[in-house]
């Protein structure tokens, strides 16, 4: 079964598969070729996940900037 392209996966599915790949790579039980293939897949997943996060952050900033009454602040400054 062919793997889905990372850009076509949900963020949650991307992270789930990435976690599975990390576990497999950390086990040390893979042949070099298999480990390299999984590493390459992991890099693709990590990049796609980062793009999804960047897109979500940009969308939040746009939504907040459309509200004239709401000042923009960093996520870390939000009170818990």
Swiss-Prot record:
GO terms for cellular component: cytosol; exodeoxyribonuclease VII complex. Pfam families: Exonuc_VII_S. GO terms for biological process: DNA catabolic process. It catalyses: Exonucleolytic cleavage in either 5'- to 3'- or 3'- to 5'-direction to yield nucleoside 5'-phosphates. It is found in: Cytoplasm. The keyword Ribosomal protein does not apply. Its EC number is 3.1.11.6. Keywords: Cytoplasm, Exonuclease, Hydrolase, Nuclease. Belongs to the XseB family. NCBIfam families: PRK00977.1-1 (NF002137), PRK00977.1-4 (NF002140), xseB (TIGR01280). Bidirectionally degrades single-stranded DNA into large acid-insoluble oligonucleotides, which are then degraded further into small acid-soluble oligonucleotides. Heterooligomer composed of large and small subunits. HAMAP family: Exonuc_7_S. This is Exodeoxyribonuclease 7 small subunit. It comes from Vibrio cholerae serotype O1 (strain ATCC 39315 / El Tor Inaba N16961).
């Amino acid at each position: 079964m062919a793997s889905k392209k990372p850009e076509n996966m949900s963020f949650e599915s991307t992270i789930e598969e990435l976690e599975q790949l990390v576990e497999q790579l950390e086990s040390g039980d893979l042949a070099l070729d298999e480990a390299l293939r999984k590493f390459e897949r992991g890099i693709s997943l990590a990049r796609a996940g980062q793009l999804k996060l960047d897109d979500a952050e940009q969308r939040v900033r746009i939504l907040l900037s459309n509200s004239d009454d709401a000042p923009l602040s960093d996520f870390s400054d939000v009170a818990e």
